[in-house]
Amino acid sequence: MITIRIGTRPSRLAVRQAEIVASAIRHAGYEVEIVKYRSEGDSDLKSPLYSIGKTGVFVERLNSLILSGDIDAAVHSAKDIPYEIDRRLRISAVMPRGRFEDALVSENPLSKLPPGSVIGTSSLRRRYQILYQRKDVKVSNIRGNVDTRIEKMRSEGMAGIVMALAAIDRLELNLRYWPFDPEKFVPAPNQGIIAVVSEDGSKASEVLSSINDADTYDDMMAERSITQGLKLGCSTPVGILSRHTGKGMRILAQFFAMDGSDMMMFDQHVDGLDDVDGIVSYIRENLPEEYGYKL
């Protein structure tokens, strides 16, 4: 029987996501081995993610191990995968999307926090979304895996931290949290999606294609197409969300000025993936130049 070796980062969330993929592969009738590797981004826990200046800092190491033959596939959070990867590789499968919303892990919702409260996040998008709603709170950089961030929140006296609901669900965390309205806090492109990369044309790619969730894959590709079409980096303060409506796809795109001074929301409906290019053109034509994007 074929054994598929899947690589993952060693964090609890990354391993849990690999286990979800492994379960799907086993259900399809194949053996699985989970292999853990550490990345550069796991070592630098002080710099904000948006300041590291390296797209896919958690992804490149694992993907290189596919090409070297050390593993057959790599499990990633889809939002971490650069929009251009080695042409020998492909995203062969995605799991059904988890809850894509962000949430404030806190004793109180954002609207009830006292002025001057400190909220932790390393995401520029989340920073600006919070400050757009509450200019009287403070946002502090916080890095590390889920457990590290929760511990830092408590030890440093923060009022809360921002986390993806999918992470809270997958780790079955017993936390008090307040989901953000995705109409106002549009999540990062591909948030909540587990993706599996393998070598194009390989046996692993064939196996993985059999466990792919088609609707989630289409939403992922719509969000990635917009981001790639506009040449947006992973650190830009932008949220993009695609959702199937039964009559096509509804796409929300939230853009903040690079300095956080203003925000613009795009809300578009398309029949399918082939129409996404029209959204790219519309955003390019209507996003103010003073926002600082080079589209």
From Swiss-Prot:
Pathway, per record: Porphyrin-containing compound metabolism; protoporphyrin-IX biosynthesis; coproporphyrinogen-III from 5-aminolevulinate: step 2/4
Gene Ontology annotations of biological process type: protoporphyrinogen IX biosynthetic process
Gene that this polypeptide is encoded by: hemC
Top-level EC class as recorded in UniProt: transferase
UniProt similarity note: Belongs to the HMBS family.
Protein EC: 2.5.1.61
Superkingdom of this protein's organism: Archaea
Keywords: Porphyrin biosynthesis, Transferase
Identification of the protein by name: Probable porphobilinogen deaminase
Role this protein plays: Tetrapolymerization of the monopyrrole PBG into the hydroxymethylbilane pre-uroporphyrinogen in several discrete steps.
Organism: Thermoplasma acidophilum (strain ATCC 25905 / DSM 1728 / JCM 9062 / NBRC 15155 / AMRC-C165)
Record-level GO cellular component terms: cytoplasm
